[in-house]
């Protein structure tokens, strides 16, 4: 009976952790998630301003909560920004066309079930490992530095 109780408790704790972190798949996904003290809208406004501030093109800003209303599904605030400067992305995509799934860069700002706001994005080093493009190290370093600058400033 103790073993069963322990097992049920472990499952419930695991499900709670997944619910709180947005259902993350684990560290091998390359997704970085950082907390924000601002609302989803304000956080995304700050991320977008930061992206523009480093000369990035804004390709799209998707409001999933607004979209969900059209199909009568209620979700917590959740927005995606697609942006890029076009410096390293085309080089990487030339060598590894599937990298177009990860490039241009994306930042997701979302609210968890506890009302906490988060910013998530894919680490450039993970993209480098995923596609193993020779000679891309400087581009990947630039991607990591740029997204860290954008998100870091947005969260101040």
Where do the language-model regions lie?
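Sec-dependent signal peptide recognition
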Residues: 2-7
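C-terminal partner/receptor-binding element of secreted or periplasmic proteins
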Residues: 125-156
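Terminal, regulation- and interaction-focused segments at domain boundaries
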Residues: 20-55
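Compact, glycine-rich, soluble single-domain proteins
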Residues: 48, 52-53, 59-105, 109
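N-terminal signal peptide c-region/cleavage motif recognized by signal peptidases
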Residues: 14-16
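Beta-strand/loop substructures that line and gate deep hydrophobic ligand-binding cavities in soluble
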Residues: 106-132
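Extracytoplasmic/secreted envelope proteins and their assembly/folding machinery
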Residues: 41-44, 48, 65, 144, ...
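Soluble non-cytosolic domains of exported or imported proteins
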Residues: 34-42, 59, 134-141
